[in-house]
C-alpha cells in the first residue's frame, strides 16, 4: 500500500511518523507535565492535580493511585502543605512496541503554612505506553507503572543490580 503525504501550501517539509512511535520531544513534554501534576501541589490544587494525573493512568494503576493518595491528600489539606518538584535529570528509553521506560531525578521542596521545611532528592520511575486518542486525555501516553522513592535508595538499588 502506497503512503500519501499531503503538504499544505508553503510547507516545504513533513514530519515522518510511523506506527507505535512519537517524537522524543512529545514523550519528554508529557513526562514533564505528568511530574508537575504529581509533585507540584498545594492544599487548594491537590484534588485537581491528582485527578488530571490519574486520568493518564491505566485503570489498574489509577485505582491503586487514588486509593493510596487519599490519606496524603487529606494530610495536605489539613496541614496546608505545599510541595514543589523540580526535575534535575530525565531519562527516557523507548523499549519497543510503543513503551517507554522513564526515570526522573528531582528535588522536592516542602512547605507547611508557607514555612520552608526542606528539600529531599527523589527518583520517580514510570512505564508509559503509547495508546489511541481518548476523550479527556491530553497525551497519547498512558502511565502503566509508577514508583516514587528517595533518590539515595534508588541509586543504591541501581548500583547493586
Give the residues covered by each predicted segment.
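Solvent-exposed, amphipathic alpha-helical segments
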Residues: 30-41
